[in-house]
Amino acid sequence: MTTTALDLGGLGLDQGAAVLLRATLAPLAPGTVVAVHGTAPTLGVHLRAFARAEGHDFTAADGMVAPTAAADQQAPLAGTLVRGTAAAARWCGAERAGAATATGTIDHPPPHWGLAARGAAVEAGGPAFHFALSHRDEVWSDDAGELYRAAAAAQWDPATAIPWDAPRHHPDCVEDALVQVLTYLIENETAALLVPARFCAQVHPHFREVMQLLAIQSADEARHIEVFTRRALLARDVLGLSTTGGQTSLQTLVDEPDFALASFLLSVLGEGSFLHLLGFLHVHAPDRCTASIMRLAAQDEARHVAFGMSHLLRHAAHEPTLLARLRLAIERRHATLQHTAGLNAEVFDALVLLAAGELTPTGMARGHAAVAELQAQMDAGRRARLKKLGFASDEAATLSALHTRNFM
């Protein structure tokens, strides 16, 4: 019978010696004897309890002669442990939760893998977790990890990234218009926060890159809400107007229960259109502070659109009926919103005034033309993304025209 020795000195099992003892036993074959030496007063008692709890045989010293392998130990012999099989038996039936790398995902991770890290050994008999989004084809994007890392690296601090003290020389009417647009943006970004936050909690942790990406997407939107609000209150005490039509449009996003459809309506159509809006506001910003806000927000939104497109392209390749479902989602949303006002006049007028920069006939003509061009760019962008997803050109044009007049 093989014997090894462990000298604990004055360290008791209740002081960390149990960790040393487990580490000594772990690589040994069952039946190996471990002679434990030590001077802690309660070591023998604690060794007996340790052995009973962890499935090893224990013999107290009680004057016994130390095994040869332990003869040179300085502390007296407290007893011997014979390595048992209980520790190994505990992990019978355990399984690996896939492989740790992104290439190690499986199609449908089981509920009993629960919160285990991908690649971990999962003990049998654990609780089953219900994650509604547990099929790879529903959520996965091959570049999810890359997009998450890019998002994490591109995080910006509102306190330092934006020149809050930049001078403002524009007229009051332009500031009022900006506050109205910012109020509208805050409302829309709140919806854009709630949608990924809700689905993040439904994704099986096996697809951790998607979970992380949705979480950081929500964090992006939280930061946008912060900076839009802070800019709106720089020179005013109250925000602008929130309309029934705008909230009704956003409710159709917040209430959409299907991840693919919600991603399509929010990221591909809504945030895709918002990219053009943020670019417009960057160009026509009345001050350097506002321009910086719009530029940074657009950088974030571009990643959101990229993930929406990437995972829907992959999803469509694995589900032939997805495009039909996306088409129906647009048509259903259009039918729900067809009797609403769409983009409220206050927001439209505010965009015209921001582009004009002044309340003059010449300025209004210039501003109105700029907003018309913005709407044309939004439509062209939607059609391009729809065609990339697989819709024919004429169908893409028809579906783009059905998109909410509220932009998001």
Where in the sequence are the language-model features?
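Terminal targeting/low-complexity segments that flank the catalytic cores of oxidoreductases
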Residues: 20, 85-212, 233-234, 238-239, ...
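Short glycine-/small-residue-rich flexible loop motifs, especially phosphate/cofactor-binding loops
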Residues: 48, 229, 279, 383
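Short acidic alpha-helical/loop segments enriched in Asp/Glu that coordinate divalent cations
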Residues: 240, 288-294, 310-325
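Domain-level signature for proteins that mediate thiol-based redox and metal-cofactor handling
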Residues: 1-102
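Active-site-proximal alpha-helical scaffolds that flank and shape metal-associated catalytic sites
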Residues: 230-302, 331-332
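Amphipathic alpha-helical segments within well-ordered protein domains
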Residues: 197-201, 279-282, 295, 309, ...
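Alpha-helical transition-metal enzyme core signature, strongest for iron centers
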Residues: 51, 185-193, 214-232, 264-275, ...
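Short, surface-exposed basic-aromatic patches at helix termini and helix-loop junctions that form
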Residues: 49-55, 233, 283-286, 313, ...
